[in-house]
Amino acid sequence: MAPVIGAAALAVALTAPAAFAIVGIARLGGAATRARVARGSTTPVTRKAAQLPEGCTVIPRIWLPDGRWIPDVVVGPHGVAIFESLPPAAASRRTGDRWEVRFSDQTWRPIENPLQKAARDADRLRRHLDAQERDFVVRVQAAVLGDPGTVGRVDGCSVVAPDDVPAWLAALPAQRGLSPDRLAHVRELLADLA
């Protein structure tokens, strides 16, 4: 009986470290994948950050308390501007107000109108900031990155070409009630959501 127990102990002693090493490597790989997905790719507005007007700060992604996320938020003297991207033209189509996107199985499925979604996200962010700030209202602008010649704007949302983002932000009027201290406070509130 003792040789069998000794052989079993030796087998465990030889295989357990290798098994734990394999499990550890698999967990590290999973964590790296989750971190890469959470970080995401560089967004168009983030790539233009150096060209933005003075005083503008880009927050690449924020998570609203209701679980929704907004990909690009720019805070500056104008208040807050959010940017969302249109789906690729080759994989999307519009029929009136209805938008559809083609999936890898070549079927077309309806999606939410990106312009209306951006306008609603801006309104959600505005309500969140209003709940946090009692003494002033922060102006929140919504824009969708795309070709203004092919997609018309809707109420509450503009269509801006990616190369025109710095000029569009520079054209927004400064919000008079947004003092440097208030602007810093809004930046802190949004950084907490990042």
Give the ranges of each region predicted by the language model.
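Active-site ExK catalytic segment of metal-dependent nucleases
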Residues: 82-90, 97
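Short glycine/proline- and charge-enriched loop/turn segments
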Residues: 97-106
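Surface-exposed interaction regions that form or flank ligand-binding interfaces
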Residues: 1-68, 75-80, 91, 106-194
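Short, well-ordered alpha-helical microsegments
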Residues: 67-70, 85
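Surface-exposed beta-strand edges and their flanking turn/coil or helix-capping segments
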Residues: 73, 95-98
